[in-house]
């Protein structure tokens, strides 16, 4: 995998926008309507920019998969982050959905740890390249990297059929949130080796 730079923004946003085109969790956040795909693209641009500020972005070597990771312990209020928040509010979610989105984020945070961790915000593969192992390879590389850095990995998915796939990669279910749809919070703890190495 390759750690992305801003020059990879267009490719990353394209991969994620196509991958999450019909995702329930994304639909919950955006305004919807005839401009829904523009809104999805705006959401992915926002997530990319936030992870470049307060996390990491990785693209597979073949440029077919992308992952956005937020490191919450690095997150802070800056003029840039405020600008991004305002932009996403007007171009993606809208005022009417603000309350729902904030309540969802608060509910998710209730099941995230107080200690340092990595939040796998988005992991996507180009639709025509799915089920070929590209996502599995990237996820395995990511979790191995964060395990070496002593960071458990948390993520959310609204795709029930993906739960067995995540389980094969060592993730366990933390909580199922009911938000008009099911949102599953998953985690992958440190391996025993890396847990002992940290102590």
Named regions from a protein language model:
Residues 52-70, 126:
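Conserved beta-hairpin
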């Amino acid at each position: 995998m390759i750690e992305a730079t801003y020059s990879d923004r267009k490719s990353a946003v394209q991969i994620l926008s196509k991958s999450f085109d019909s995702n329930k969790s994304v639909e919950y956040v955006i305004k919807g309507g005839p401009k829904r795909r523009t809104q999805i693209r705006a959401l992915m641009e926002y997530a990319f920019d936030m992870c470049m500020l307060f996390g990491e972005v990785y693209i597979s070597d073949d440029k077919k998969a992308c992952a956005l990771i937020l490191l919450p312990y690095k997150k802070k209020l800056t003029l840039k982050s405020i600008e991004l928040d305002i932009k996403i509010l007007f171009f993606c979610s809208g005022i009417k959905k603000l309350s729902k989105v904030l309540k969802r984020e608060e509910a998710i945070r209730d099941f995230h740890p107080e200690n340092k961790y990595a939040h796998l915000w988005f992991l996507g593969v180009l639709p025509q390249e799915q089920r070929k192992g590209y996502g599995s390879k990237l996820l395995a590389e990511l979790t191995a990297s964060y395990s070496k850095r002593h960071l458990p990995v948390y993520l959310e998915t609204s795709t029930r059929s993906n739960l067995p796939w995540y389980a094969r990669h060592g993730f366990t279910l933390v909580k199922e949130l009911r938000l008009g749809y099911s949102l599953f919070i998953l985690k992958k703890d440190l391996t025993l080796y890396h847990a002992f190495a940290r102590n």
